[in-house]
A protein has these predicted regions:
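His/Glu-based metal-binding/catalytic segments typifying zinc-dependent metallopeptidases
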Residues: 138, 227-287, 375-393, 398, ...
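M16 family metallopeptidases and their MPP-like homologs
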Residues: 25, 30-43, 53-54, 71-115, ...
Length: 925
């Protein structure tokens, strides 16, 4: 097996007697164990009259087995032992995965293995979970991506299984005359879930021999029906599915143009990755690129290439553009430009050195590969096992074995006018069809011969240029020598308006680094209008950088700038050798900043559209946005931002930036394999660009509205959607480690029980959960439900009943369950950083939180260790019981429940401005 020299794991690949392929992974340092099983069965395998059956089966396997019959037992066991679990159903595969504390791994595996040998398919659970599947379907009825996907299913070959309805609902999964859904799901599981279609991956600190013994004992009984090598013999396309324009009406306000080129399946070419070559050239964003020239015309705002649906016998290659309103009127011109660029590639762009550049980038990424989270690792590799040869399971994603011009040119033939399907997504077009299941309006029109001739013309207005050699690619990479230093960040510059933190990494020893720069300014967040100006400036700056930074991103470096409650933060990450060069270039662009009126108008309209579109988001998302906007004055809700943006003009921005520069406070963190002097050098570059001298400006305050001892507050948000939703937030008044431990443990203990009670048992909705929700360093806990079945008043009643009874759940836990739950949370909090970037982020958060001793985590763990069951019961009764709790209830009454009784509890929040006059905690960071 081809492994990275940076990979310290031990691997063993084997095939069980029943044909199940297994990958075992041992790590000496693993703090968590994980497993994933994938089966080569998906919605393509659904019976035509039972569409959604594979998805329904995926749900049912979690709900009881012969050995462990209790519904929800698996999830409770995993949750109590510090783990998580999930699954997904795709076109041709279904994947199940979980992680858990290592001491519970054997028992968790035993429960997991029963899914595939002896599921119960309990009648009551079948009926309730069918409701959950139906709720999941209804949840996505207004989801544009799902609505567009359905149209794609209708314009390809109707005989191909891609055309099937994948989710299922009450209609497709109900009992019928003479047809019991239970009989059919049992038969589907028995006939389709064959061991020779399965792959299994385990990860943990257990030895490979121990893991192998478990696997052989638990998974060898899965039956083998000799199904390996199954294939799809129906082509995905017909003559009518290319050479057409498909117009689709979205729900949200956006415009997109997608050119789709159907191709044969590409699995056999994974070791060459021929399509990535074309994706890079078409997606290039530098001078002379397709994107830049279309952008300069004011027709598009972004362009990407290479993505698209893929399966065992098909692969779509797409070129996708986000259009401006003017771009909708120039669709044929944009298509013509794409084909002219493709002609240039055919004539001048077939060069081995371009392939070798991409190969070098992937080889560096593989060589200095950093560990993934155990759950991410097993769920990724178990799918790789379905596609790659055993020796390439780890390496296959990075493998580029050599330039094959004959193969490249053969694939270029598919990128033709006769083999394209163009999809235009925009409002206000002509539609004469309605898609099944999601009711999407659309139309299909064949291109005329005149249009096809136009698409193939060479137009002199396009001055396209292919990318030059990439100056950012690093061919000779090794970590820099390690200077003697501590293991924690050190403050190496401490000026009035500037602080520089530095740490040279001594653990991961990879030639990578991360730079954070927080630019705080009270002026940047002084009003909603200033907050919007700050975001506008950030978006315009990022827009101006794209053409110069694209090559750096291709070479394994990344950057971002984002606005927050105190100002803006700039981050850079990637290979350290040339990251200072990227920082210097970004700062040079900042010094020469200009606010182009045309780009300003485009970006302004883009932001307006995004913020207005939020009114079409799921009700639960709108409630969370309204909640944070209510409690964090420096983080207004989207509607407030959109209103403020309407008034802003381009000529206001230059003086606005100058006023920020006149009173800013900068904090910088340089972490990676850079030595101290290099950190000073980067800081000097930064201070020169931002004109940082000896200013005496402080960091901006981040106010948080405190609920105080006032019982329940409630506010209704009008979402104009079918579903109702409720979010209940409990706020902690202090930021002490003990409080963090209490809120974290409460959430950890109640999450699985709440899910089981509200979703599995009561079937109130598909989106159900609890979560930690710290705001401005204050711990908080949130409970939420979005429901097609119940109005907010009923949802709040159900949540309150759960909270009122939860202390009984705690009393009924035996000592083993109590200590296992604490240990599970302990392991989650104490999990060591697995990547350099992950550690950088944790240390940066500590710097922002003024945890300058970097020991907040240890303090929380110490408090967690001390917590008793009596402490937790006291906390639940005193802080979470609805009658006495200080909380904020956000709710939205769906159209389906418009006549249901309204919520009447606590103090209703009418005016946001008045509510925000309440006492605030104005902290830093």
């Amino acid at each position: 097996m081809h492994l990275s020299p940076n990979d310290s794991n031990q691997y063993r690949y084997l095939t069980l007697s029943n044909g199940l392929r297994v990958l075992l992974i041992h790590s000496d340092t693993a703090q968590q164990s994980a497993a994933a099983l994938a089966v080569n069965v998906g919605h393509f395998d659904d019976p035509v009259d039972r569409q959604g059956l594979a998805h329904y089966l995926e749900h049912m396997l979690f709900l009881g087995t012969e050995k462990y019959p209790k519904v929800g037992e698996f999830q409770s066991y995993i949750s109590q032992h510090g783990g998580t679990n999930n699954a997904w159903t795709g076109t041709e595969h279904t994947c199940f995965f979980f992680d858990v504390t290592p001491s519970a791994f054997e028992n968790a595996l035993d429960r997991f293995s029963q899914f595939f040998t002896a599921p119960l398919f309990n009648e009551e659970a079948l009926d309730k979970e069918r409701q959950a599947v139906d709720s999941e379907y209804k949840l996505k009825l207004n989801d544009d991506s799902r609505r567009l996907y359905q149209v794609n299913k209708e314009v390809i070959n109707p005989e191909h299984p891609f055309s099937k309805f994948s989710v299922g609902n009450l209609d497709t999964l109900g009992d019928r005359d003479g047809q019991s859904i239970r009989d059919e799901i049992v038969e589907f599981h028995h006939s389709q879930y064959s061991a020779d279609l399965m792959t299994l991956t385990l990860f943990g600190p257990q030895s490979l021999d121990e893991q192998q013994a478990w696997v052989e004992a638990m998974f060898a009984d899965i039956p083998n029906h000799q199904l390996s090598g199954k294939s799809i013999n129906v082509p995905i396309g017909t003559e009518d599915s290319t050479g057409i324009l498909v117009q689709i009406e979205p729900i949200k306000e956006f415009r997109k143009l997608i050119l789709t080129f159907p191709m044969p399946g590409m699995d056999k070419h994974y070791g060459v990755k021929p399509l990535s070559y074309f994706a890079h050239l078409l997606g290039y964003e530098g001078e002379g690129s397709l994107m830049l020239q279309l952008k300069s015309k004011g027709w598009i705002t972004s362009l990407s290439a290479g993505g698209g649906a893929s399966g065992s016998n098909y692969r779509d290659f797409t070129v996708s553009c986000t259009l401006t309103p003017e771009g909708v009127d120039h669709v044929d011109d944009i298509i013509q430009a794409v084909f002219q660029y493709l002609t240039m590639i055919k004539q001048d762009g077939m060069n081995e050195w371009r392939y070798l550049e991409k190969q070098a980038v992937l080889e560096s990424a593989f060589r200095f590969q950093e560990p993934s989270r155990p759950l991410d690792l097993v769920s990724h590799l178990v799918i790789n096992m379905q596609h790659y040869q055993p020796h390439d399971i780890i390496y296959g994603d990075y493998k580029m074995s050599g330039y094959d011009e004959d193969l490249q040119r053969s694939l270029l033939q598919y990128l033709s006018v006769d083999n394209v399907r163009v999809t235009l997504i925009a409002k206000g077009l002509e539609y004469n069809r309605t898609a099944e299941w999601y009711f999407t309006p659309y139309s299909v029109t064949p291109f005329s011969s005149e249009q096809k001739r136009f698409f193939q013309q060479i137009d002199p207005r396009w001055q396209f240029v292919l990318p030059e050699k990439n100056p950012y690619i690093c061919y000779d990479l090794d970590p820099m020598p390690f200077e003697n230093g501590g293991s924690l960040p050190e403050l190496i510059e401490d000026l009035e308006g500037f602080r520089l933190w530095h740490l040279q990494d001594d653990e991961f020893r990879v030639p990578k680094g991360v730079v954070y720069v927080a630019i705080d300014s009270s002026h940047a967040v002084a009003s909603p209008k200033n907050i919007v100006k700050t975001r506008l400036c950030v978006e315009m700056f990022l827009d101006s950088l794209a053409k110069e930074t694209y090559q750096a991103e291709i070479a394994g470096m990344g950057y971002n700038m984002y606005a927050h409650q105190g100002g803006v933060t700039l981050t850079l990450s990637g290979f350290s050798q040339k990251l200072p060069q990227l920082l210097e270039m970004i700062l040079r662009r900042f010094a020469a900043r200009e606010f182009n009126p045309t780009r300003f108008e485009t970006i302004k309209q883009q932001l307006l559209r995004n913020w207005r579109n939020s009114s079409q988001d799921r009700p639960i998302s709108q409630l969370f946005n309204a909640l944070t906007g209510l409690l964090q004055p420096n983080n207004p809700p989207f509607a407030t931002l959109a209103e403020a943006l309407e008034e802003i003009e381009v000529d206001e921005l230059s003086t606005f930036v100058e006023s920020i520069l006149a009173e800013l406070h900068v904090e910088m963190f340089v972490y990676g394999d850079w030595q101290r002097q290099q950190a000073h050098d980067m800081a000097t570059t930064l201070k020169d660009a931002l004109r940082v001298k000896e200013q005496r400006y402080e960091e901006a305050l981040r106010p948080l509205i405190m609920l105080g001892q006032n019982g329940s507050f409630q506010r209704e948000v009008h979402c104009n959607q079918q579903d109702s939703a409720v979010v209940i937030y409990h706020q902690c008044e202090d930021i002490e480690p003990r409080s963090i431990a209490l809120y974290s443990l409460a959430n950890h203990l109640m999450s699985a029980t709440f899910f089981h009670e509200i979703r599995t048992k009561q079937q109130l909705g598909y989106m159900v959960g609890t979560g930690n929700m710290p705001l401005n360093r204050h711990p908080g806990i949130v409970l939420y439900v979005q429901s097609p079945n119940a109005a907010p008043a009923e949802l709040v009643t159900s949540i309150d009943e759960f909270l009122n009874a939860f202390y009984m759940v705690l009393l009924e836990l035996n000592d083993y369950q109590w200590h296992s739950s604490k240990r599970g949370l302990w392991n989650q909090i104490a999990t060591p950083d697995t990547t350099l970037r992950g550690r950088a982020q944790r240390l940066w958060v500590a710097i922002g939180n003024k945890d300058t001793e970097f020991n907040q985590r240890e303090k929380v763990l110490a408090e967690l260790k001390k917590l008793t069951r009596a402490d937790m019961i006291r906390f639940v009764v005193n802080e979470l019981k609805p009658r006495t709790a200080n909380r904020l209830v956000m709710h939205s009454q769906g159209q389906a429940h418009i006549d249901a009784p309204r919520i009447h509890l606590g103090q209703e929040i009418g005016s946001i401005e008045e509510f925000q006059l309440r006492p605030k905690d104005c902290g830093l960071g």
